[in-house]
A protein has these predicted regions:
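Extended intrinsically disordered terminal tails
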Residues: 1-145
Length: 145
């Protein structure tokens, strides 16, 4: 009917677009993780971390600090359970633990990303090799004619 005519006309003019193709599940999962990846990138830039060694060097003192504060807090829980210092320690521990978690995630996910990049490069090289082979066979076919 008329509605279909309008859809067809607007589509041909480029006003209406086709449905976007389905995104692969792997890519969809990566998109979901995008906010976390951005947060990790900002963390790396903020602390000027460029290698895993620097990441470990940043994380180690944090873990030692958390351990010392936890030990102090445990001692305070026994001696004065309602002390103000316990709340102060908890406020200091929260961002330290968050930074440690981010460091651990960066370390794990950077390895995963390296592996994905390696696989993508392999697939790209294989595709280029296949293209070269088909191009050579086409050239041979045209030369033999």
């Amino acid at each position: 009917g008329i509605q279909a005519l309008y859809y067809s006309y607007l589509y041909q003019m480029g006003v209406l677009k086709q449905k976007p193709k389905r995104i692969s599940p792997v890519l969809r999962a990566d998109i979901r993780k995008l906010d976390a990846r951005i947060e990790q990138m900002e963390f790396l830039q903020k602390h000027q971390i460029t290698t895993r060694e620097e990441l470990l060097a940043y994380r180690t003192p944090l873990e030692e600090q958390v351990q010392a504060l936890t030990k102090e807090r445990k001692r305070l829980y026994r001696s004065e359970p309602d002390g103000v210092r316990i709340g102060q320690i908890n406020k200091v521990l929260k961002p330290l633990r968050k930074d440690i978690r981010i460091c651990i995630r960066i370390e794990q996910q950077s390895r995963e990303m390296e592996e994905r990049m390696r696989l993508a490069e392999q697939i790209q090289r294989q595709a280029e090799q296949e293209e070269d082979k088909t191009e050579k066979t086409r050239q041979k076919e045209t030369e033999s004619r």
